[in-house]
Regions:
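Substrate/ligand-engaging "lid" and interaction regions
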Residues: 1-196
Length: 196
C-alpha cells in the first residue's frame, strides 16, 4: 500500500517535528504461494545471484515450527517454512550464498531462524521431497548464515495525534491498516529522535 512510500515523523525533544519521505522500498510482495504472481517474483529474486541478504521483522512468534506445517511439505503456510521453500529455490539455482537476518528484538534471534529452517529442511529430506544436499546447504555457514542482531530501537504503532497533525497538514490517504494478526501499518512512522 501507499505506493511503497512512507513518511518518517521524527519527534524531537525540543518539540520540533521533522518529516522525511522514505522511498527505499522498491517493491512489495505477498509471501504467499496462493498469490502466484507475487510468489513467482519472490522465487525469481531468490534465484538471482545478486541477492546477498534477506531480513524480516515478524515478532518472535513468527519463528515457530508447527508439526502440521512440517507435514505440508513444500507448501508451508508459516513464515519459516516459506523462507525454507525460497531457500530451496536458491539452492536449485546454484547453491548461492545468502545471509538470513532477523531484525526482531529477541535473544539469539539468528539461532531461532536457523533452528526453524533446519527443521523444515530436515523434514523435507526425510519425506523425500528434497535431496540431502539441501539440508547440507542450509547448514553450511559459508553458504547460508543466520547472524544474531541487536535491535535498539522499536518503532511504535502509528500514533493518532501524529496522524491528525499530518491530516491537518494536508497529508492525504493517511489511514492505518490493522491486519488480521492485529499488527498496524500506516503511511507514516512516528518515532522519537535518536538520543545518542
Amino acid at each position: 500500500p501507499y505506493d511503497n512510500l512512507s513518511l518518517l515523523v521524527c519527534l524531537k525533544s525540543t518539540g520540533e517535528i521533522e518529516k522525511k519521505v522514505v522511498a527505499s522500498v522498491t517493491e512489495s510482495l505477498k509471501a504467499d504461494p496462493s498469490f502466484t504472481e507475487d510468489w513467482a517474483r519472490l522465487v525469481e529474486i531468490f534465484q538471482n545471484p545478486s541477492l546477498q541478504m534477506i531480513s524480516f521483522t515478524i515478532t518472535e512468534k513468527g519463528y515457530g515450527v508447527a508439526p502440521a506445517d512440517l507435514e505440508r511439505g513444500l507448501t508451508p503456510v508459516l513464515a519459516m517454512g516459506k523462507v525454507t521453500a525460497l531457500l530451496y529455490e536458491r539452492f536449485k539455482a546454484g547453491k548461492l550464498p545468502l545471509t538470513v537476518q532477523s531484525m526482531d528484538n529477541c535473544s539469539h534471534n539468528g539461532d531461532k531462524v536457523k533452528t526453524a529452517v533446519h527443521a523444515y529442511a530436515a523434514k523435507w529430506v526425510e519425506q523425500g521431497l528434497v535431496p540431502a544436499e539441501f539440508l547440507a546447504y542450509v547448514q553450511d555457514e559459508t553458504k547460508v548464515t543466520f547472524p544474531w542482531s541487536m535491535i535498539d530501537k522499536i518503532t511504535p504503532r502509528p500514533d493518532a495525534k501524529v496522524q491528525k497533525m499530518l491530516a491537518d497538514d494536508g497529508f492525504e490517504d493517511n489511514y492505518t491498516i490493522v491486519t488480521e494478526k492485529h499488527t498496524f501499518t500506516a503511511p507514516f512512522v512516528n518515532a522519537e529522535e535518536t538520543q545518542y
